[in-house]
A protein has these predicted regions:
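A short, Lys/Arg-rich alpha-helix, primarily the initiator
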Residues: 1-14
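Histidine kinase transmitter module recognition
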Residues: 14-15, 54
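Short alpha-helical DNA-recognition segment
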Residues: 16-35, 50
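DNA major-groove recognition helix of helix-turn-helix/homeodomain DNA-binding modules
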Residues: 27, 46-61
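DNA major-groove recognition helix of helix-turn-helix
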Residues: 37, 55, 66
Length: 66
């Protein structure tokens, strides 16, 4: 099963977006977002909600809940 940060990377790359683009959307820096996407830091729930809306996917999908 994929980790949520792997799904976030796939969603971003599928849309040809850079980490800096998503960091701006979330109101954070590229460095902080990179740590989320690499699994080094836990992503806050409010960021996950924002990304669900942006990517038009469910939290279940991002979190790998089936």
């Amino acid at each position: 099963m994929k980790q949520y940060w792997e799904r976030l990377r796939e969603l971003r790359e599928d849309r040809d977006l850079k980490q800096a683009d998503i960091a701006t959307l979330l109101g954070t820096t590229q460095q902080v977002y990179s740590r989320y996407e690499n699994g080094k830091n836990e992503m806050p729930v409010h960021h996950i909600i924002t990304l669900c809306k942006f990517y038009m996917v469910s939290a279940d999908y991002i979190l790998g809940i089936e």
